[in-house]
Amino acid sequence: MADVDDGSELLFFDTFSHEEVTDINLDLVQFPKPVFITQVRIIPLGARVQADFPGGVRLGATNPSKFDLEFFVNDLGMPAASAFENLGLLRYNQNDCIHLDCSQEKIVTDGLVLRGWYSTITLAIYGIFTNSVTEPIASPTLPCEPVGPEIANLSGEVLLQEDVLKDEWQEPMQAELLTAHKGNVSDYDPEDMEYGMSRDHYHQHAEEQEQREMRRLRRSTHSTDHSPPPPRRSHTHSESNDREYIRCSRDKGSRDWSRSPEYSSHRSRRKRSERSRSVVDEHKWPRTPPASIDSPTRPRSPDTMDYEDEDSRSHYKMQSSHYRHSSESLHRGERDRDDEDRSCTPQEQFEPILSDDEIIGDDEEDDAVDAAAIAEYERELEAAAAAAPPAIDAFEPWQKPLLVFEGDMAAHFCKELETLKLLFKKLVLQTRCENVNAFSEEHGASVDEREQFVYLGEQLNNQLGYLAQHYKRRNFVLQQFFGNDELHLRQAANVLQIALSFQAACMQPQPAFKIRHIKLGARMAELLGSSEELFQHLLKEHKFDIFEAVFRLYHEPYMALSIKLQLLKAVYALLDTRMGIEHFMGAKNNGYQMIVEAIKTAKLTRTKYALQAIIKKLHLWEGLESVQIWCRRLFVDRIIIPGNRDQMEDTVITCQQIEFAFEMLMDALFSSQLSYLQPRRFLPVSKKFEVVTDPTAQRSFGNALQSYLGQNSLAESLLVMLANCKELPATTYLSMLDLMHTLLRSHVGIDYFVDDAFPVTQTIVAILLGLDEVPRNPEEKEEKAEKSDAEDKAMEVENEAVEAGGEKPTPPTADEEGKPVAAPISVPAPAAAPQVRPRPILRPVLPRLARLGIEMSYKVQTRYHLDAIAYAAAAPEYDAVKLATHMHAIYSQTCDPAGRQHTVEVLGLNNNLKIFMDLIKKEQRLQTQRQLSSPGTKYKSPVLSYAVDMVDACVRYCEQLDYLIEHGGVILELAKNHETFEPSVSAVLQEMYVYMKPLEAINVFVYDDIMPLVEVIGRSLDYLTTFPGDLIMAMRILRYLSISKPLAGQKAPPVTEELKHRFVALQLYAADGVQLCIQIMERLCAYFEQPGAHAPALMTIQGVHCCQIMLPTLQILRELLSYAILCRDGTYKDLTAIDHLVKVYYLLYYFPTRCQAGPEVEQCKMEVVQTLLAYTQPNEQDEESLHKSLWTLMIREVLKNVDGPAHFIPGLKLLAELLPLPLPMPQPLCDQLQQQHKQRLITERKLWSAHLHPQSGQIAKLVEALAPSSFPQLSELLQRVCMQLSDLAPNMTLLIAKTITELLCNEYQTSNCIPTTNLERLLRFSTRLCAFAPLKSSMLSILSGKFWELFQSLLALNEFNDVVSNCQEAVHRILDSFLDSGISLISHKSTASPALNLAAALPPKELIPRIIDAVFSNLTSVEVTHGISILAVRNLVILTEHDFTFYHLAQLLKQKITEFQAWMERVILHNETVEYNANIESLILLLRSLTQIEPPPAMSAMPHRTLKLGATELAQLVEFQDIELAKPPVLSRILTVMEKHKAVANEAALSDLKQLILLQASKQEILAGTSTETPPEAEGEANPSASSCSASLTVEPYLPQAEGIVTQYEARPIFTRFCATAENAQLTARYWLDPLPIELIEDMNEPIYERIACDLTDLANVCLNPDLNVAGDSKRVMNLSGSPQSNREMTPTAPCFRTRRVEVEPATGRPEKKMFVSSVRGRGFARPPPSRGDLFRSRPPNTSRPPSLHVDDFLALETCGAQPTGPTGYNKIPSMLRGSRVGRNRGSRISAAAAFRQKKMMRIGSPSSWAESPGSYRSASDSHFSSSDSHYSSPHYSGRPRGRGLRSRPSYLR
């Protein structure tokens, strides 16, 4: 160690550490008493230091190896000790310069501030203790100078106005001291004008910068008295702070504008969101506070509390204090100044550093003088704060109206219009183009003029081609050029006629000019074909048929192929307008026929391809036109006749045609777009390595398609269909939603919705979101309130447009009110219709509609802001305020996860990102201009910051990489040159650079070599759990190269298959790509071990980053495995990936439902399922190979992983996703599709059953293990899986049935025939399974034997505790299903014998009498008020539905009439003497069912009932034989009870009872007369012949033996009619695939005794190993321990420039490389409550002891999991508690907006079914044995709603 000055001693030795090196860091050393600092020495990394204090050798830990370090001290020798003194600058270099000598300064100080770009620093400070301190000197008051009015705007241009821009818009001033300002504006320095202050002001207050620096430092480490120290960069401001700031801000006096120019704020991303609105609302703020507020007794330097947080301004803080904002870092600046350069004149005042309370206290001394001014100023501040909007301009689709930008297009496109006019003028002046004849030599046209025509015509074509690049621009310019201007029309017509004239072309002297002339004409016709004005002018005025002229050229002999193709392009473009198509199709020679003939005669493939593109374009027009006609016919012109079969059939046919048109449009948008284009140099082949796209052809087709959509009013058709969706078939309704989603994925659809159909779009969004009216602007609401009778200028135009589109609007009807979407929104009603108050619907019923509405609203709003930004950027006057306002709004949209996704999708479309790239270039040029006057200064610009933020958002979150191909190189260079920008922008660019690293490889998007990408991924694996951006981007690029674009709903293969993707997949597979993907999945699953415990982290941005890695990994793995299995077929046996795929699914299951990555999680789940289904591709031929097939092995691995409590529910859900959904499924409209699907569905289920059969034992074990579960959610999901398994084939349903039966019997026998809780659970589990038709059939086939004996034994039990009662209730419910003939595999259209169908639906006929006896015996033995009694009566009622069961029931009642009458007496007595009970209504229903026959259902395959009891039998049944005659009849007693309790009795039961009394009375009348007389007519109507009925009851009806279960399976229905709006849960895929939410499970399914008390401590002692370290393992699982991996993994995102340090593994002692994670900012400084003393001097000592812990001791403590505290303690906060954030990334921004996100979640996520999956993954037609339908129905097993087959039952027995 080098010698130091004599007398110097070591004052301080310690290490400071920080998380990141990306920020300038500050640290403070405080000494216990004043000292002279003589030397500061930095200890390099690894350097050994021998110290005199205890502890021996220490090691340096300074990192990085080079940086600049500035030192500041509190100079106690200066007057009032108020100035920070610059002690010096050390340019640290570990090999050269490590110490700073300060012996010359001799400054007395008690604190040292360090500022530098370091992450860790070890330093030693030497000095001399002293006691000399200069006393403070009082100072006179300084007069307040007014602020100059000259202020510059954001672009640097001078604005001579009084409104002062807010501080956050201003840019930092250079720290130099210059001369006083002049009075002339031109003499101002630009940076002076930026701040509105002169250099005089700055010169006068030069020393006050140090005061502001110290106050800034002090504020950065102190908080309010009642709040704990918040985490670094996450200061939360309370309301008390807001009020305190308002009070303090009045002390600023006339220097309120002042702020530290050099230490300007290092804004976070959240800060930028607030900058945007400051200028907009600047008029609401007072420019300066009253001058009299300054204290007259003592001058005060300007308070700089606004030094850092823009949100600390009161108007932000009052409304947005709930946002978290990052604290800010200090900027680097020039700080070396000599004492001579400072003014030390008496006029320069100094003051001691005071606390905030002291400042406020000083104000109290002047209250008598300043009270009025203070109150007025505070009122101004509070009013401005109340009027200020929130920091984040949240877009709320349910509340905020959609907007469309209506800029001044004439001014915007004036240059293009003038250029076009100039070119035509030159053509007219320099050539003879009056007509074709004038172009010839005979009329004086020279050779030069003819050649000039070609030159100028090509220039004109170039300009027209430029116009055609933008649909809106082309239409506007041509409409302005030709609209009502005969001169221009005449000029263009003449030029076009000459250009298309073969004669004129032949007049060209040179052959080259002849060809150029013809090409010129073809191109001009193509470019001018979209103008209807010109087309009409040519036809009417010139009698010129442009189609005829083009075809004449086409058929000229020896015409070259290239020219023919160009002429066909002209024909193609001329068909963009309705007038062009009508003329083309209606000509003398039909144009369509001409094209067909040309195809027949064409010999070249390229010619045929171009001709068929014209045909397809005409078909597309016809389809869109027919949709408009059919929608008008269906919903506007038609009068609905209920029950009209012809009308229903016509509707089905029409809807089928609409579906075909929609499929054609979706096909044209994506999958087969190439077949609609006219690409250059394209040879159509079936397979090609790469199809080179032609942007011009794509743009031409896009323009044509948008024109077609507008001319055929597609949006109006969609609106009408959406409003009348109840009348649509399911497939049509879903096809319409698919089309809307497809349109929103393309820029053509978004442009159409915004530019051509905006009023209708607003109404569509309102319907999708379930709103009762379109949201309006507040201004519009006020206008409407003031002028209720006036037409609203904004919204009523929309309604008129909708009415014009519909012409004959339909009024809202009752039907529409029952729709699943918003009932009040429909086609607007006529004015004459009565005013019906709409019922407000705040939420949609269907989640898919809401998601579609949110997507549409965000994308339309994004287009509005993009248009506004583009117009403002191109305006002659660069208005940065307007730009920043719109950019802030679009930035705010990205604060919501859904809005962020939809916003970046729009940015990635149609080269929209170019808008922001151009803005960045423009801002860079402006900064270069500013730097001419102030070299080296980095200016701030909100426009630049927002533009960089939006590019960053696109880079981070946009999955489509078209933007990267276009702008990737520019973005990469921008990120590399981040140091040229101010720090806040530089930090964003540095983080963006990590994402852009893969683009450093040469030609990364070339398909020849993907090894650079594989290397990037391999390198990133070590840092996988930090979610590095380079890995995310590399995986996205690899996915782009290896997988063709996903085409939703693609049914036909593309025209030309590209082989490049398969080539990349082969390269990746050869480079161990499968293992690479498995490693990524394995590490993520290991990091989130026990994922249920990580749910809070998965809810945050950490979950988003996890999915950003997981999704492309799964997609690539699926592509590789699918291709490998397809190629190798049955020889592929690698099952390595299955375990990892299942674990990934478990991890995805535990993502919270409404997490930020919700859509990505669902997509990842689908990818896992589809990847597993790839193992079902091989076709096995024999039974032996079937047992070892890849399909069977995959199922075995999946079942094997359902191995623990945390895996039961997600494992069953995965199994449910893999298995086919139960039949029947919705019936397609097309009969041909129905036949195709039928065979495929049956074959698919047979194959699944065959491959599951070898795993029968494993399936049985799974059911046995989970069936007794008391957890309702698990039991519910297992029931669904069992139903899916049993639906496959007879062998699987028998497996499930036998497993359940064995479980029940074994449980009963094991418990010595005593019912147990476990048996009750199993019976309750079986109840629902027996109501499922396939399982009922198999259960009935094995019912005879011990299964029935179990039921009989349970029903015979007479001890009635809760367990027995519940068991008996379950048995009754099972018998209910067994006896219900409506639950059957037999279709209602079955042609078999009805008796045979009945035999299949009932238990074996020999068991039926025993079942009836057991039910009746149980009924008579239980209490009449018990629920079992009602269930037993219900089963007896079901027995009356068919003759066979009715016969045996009647025989039993005759045999046991005494018991029946005794039971009746008990029921009647209870109701007479105790209380009214519903069992008396059950008795009435039973008697009614015995005596009356219900009318048969319309469609039934079961035999009709013919038997019933007559009046005599009824009398025998209800009349007692041995009772007193004084007692009234039974029915009369029942009537008395019903009349007595009429208020609660059921009216239907009372009506039935009166009919029974009448029937009994008819029997008494017969007895009073002759016994041989016939019954009265009334009885004859009810019973045709009593005697015949009685006779029939003596003969048992015939019931044949039931068919086998295999035969029943073959006869079951495959399809059923399905209504998309029907409220039947079983008809949707969600019912089968989603676990039942716990909150929806009824209490009756979870009895109280099932909630078993449990002592977790005892359970842990029993189940866990005594040697297990629970605390340590818990920390390890939660990544809270100090293991070598954990600290690296705690950082949620990768830092830009990774730094590493050596850690020691506690177990092994070996060093381990790990990511460096530092302590929170502030070094654990205490935060005492404010006091009147000096905060700097009153802070308790924390780093002042020289013998303190060294960095190595810190690392040892940290590694062992300890929490070091004390003077150098880290006081680390785990990342889980601190929140998921790093630096300034977008994640911290979103995490910070907690209140905003919570509001959005409440708004978007309130319905419980909001996050339900949109449907089955099986909608993709290319999956193996997949189904294109996502909804399934099953009327055969859905159970009877009232328990009596297909006939309705009285409501009182529900």
From Swiss-Prot:
Ranges in coiled-coil conformation: 779-808
Region span, Disordered: 202-361, 777-821, 1570-1589, 1720-1788, 1804-1854
Keywords tagged on the record: Coiled coil, Developmental protein, Differentiation, mRNA processing, mRNA splicing, Nucleus, Phosphoprotein, Sexual differentiation
The UniProt record lists the keyword Aminoacyl-tRNA synthetase: no
Protein's name in the database: Protein virilizer
List of residues that carry Phosphoserine: S186, S258, S260, S276, S295, S301, S312
Its biological purpose: Associated component of the WMM complex, a complex that mediates N6-methyladenosine (m6A) methylation of mRNAs, a modification that plays a role in the efficiency of mRNA splicing and is required for sex determination. Required for sex determination and dosage compensation via Sxl alternative splicing: m6A methylation acts as a key regulator of Sxl pre-mRNA and promotes female-specific alternative splicing of Sxl, which determines female physiognomy. M6A methylation is also required for neuronal functions.
InterPro entries: VIR_N, Virilizer
Subcellular location: Nucleus
Effect on the protein upon substituting E1423K: In vir1ts; transforms XX animals into intersexes at 29 degrees Celsius
Composition-biased stretches (Low complexity): 1738-1748, 1816-1838
